[in-house]
Amino acid sequence: DSDKLKAFYLAVSNCKCVKVGFDSCCVPGIVTWMDVNPTLIESCESARFSAFISEDMKMYPCSFMANTNLWGDLRATSLLNIWQNSPAFKNHRAKILNSKCRGCKHYHICNGGCVFMPEINQCKNNYSDLW
């Protein structure tokens, strides 16, 4: 529920008594609802500069993708081969490159938000069909 998320971001931004850490998946909400210096924000790097490797040696573009079929098996092939040739990584990058957000003035901060879970994107543009 975006109203609850908005209320959360506003409450946290007004509270100076505690420190709250955010996952990079929260960047669209932070940019939209909080007064934060953009140079202090690090956006999602999934399939751009990072990957998640599970304890069973499956490599995913993002840790949120664990327990899906979007992985490469490091027991069967190399990290480089998965990174460059896996359908999961190729499809993830294609969605990033085709994002409607690329022309947005905030794109350099959030990189278009979350490809895998668009419901967590809290951008003011509110593209319901973002991906």
Protein language model annotation of sequence segments:
Residues 58-59, 64-131:
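Flexible mid-to-C-terminal extensions adjoining Fe-S/redox cofactors in radical SAM and related proteins
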